[in-house]
Amino acid sequence: SCGKATTRMEVKIDSPDPQNVAGEIICKGANLMLGYYKNAEATSQIIDVNGWLHTGDLATMDTEGYVTVRGRSKNMLLTASGQNIYPEEIESKLNNMPYVSESLIVLQNDKLVALIYPDFDDAFAHGMEQSDIEKVMEDNRNELNLQLPAYCQITKVKIHFEEFEKTAKKSIKRFMYQEVKG
């Protein structure tokens, strides 16, 4: 959980079942922005006619008002069976596993694939070779899958040999990796 909303602010989850089904976080209050300066079109895309600010973040909220962020709406993956996958949740777990520097979960042929940029410096410092790194990543995949529901399980790991391209804010440019084939 990332906590509760501050006083003087209303927060809702735009979902038919906010406790169990993630929806977009929307908020309203005197302490929020009024819009984008001299850009009515951009403002109308995030602030609706009722004054609710649409954050683009997906979350659930418990009965006490605690919000748990699941990911970004633009990053959500939708499987052919209709399951919503929040890649950030899986990546967060994967990034804490041995020798993983950073990762990206993508959908390929309706299967979840982990693109992993290993911590090569650490692995090589421990005397590992490429084949050892590949084995560790496969072990990580198996361990991770024990923690995930069946519909979220990773079917394959692909080693990425360079850091993922980033935005100015140091976020991975996901769109560059979504259509990876093979």
Predicted regions and their residues:
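Adenylate-forming
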Residues: 32, 66-93, 122-132, 148-154, ...
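Short, hydrophobic beta-strand segments
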Residues: 75-77, 114-122, 160-164
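Conserved ATP-binding/catalytic segment of the ANL
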Residues: 17-20, 24-79
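Residue-level signal for inorganic ion chemistry
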Residues: 11, 65, 94, 114, ...
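Short Gly/Pro-enriched turn/cap motifs at secondary-structure boundaries
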Residues: 1-5, 49-50
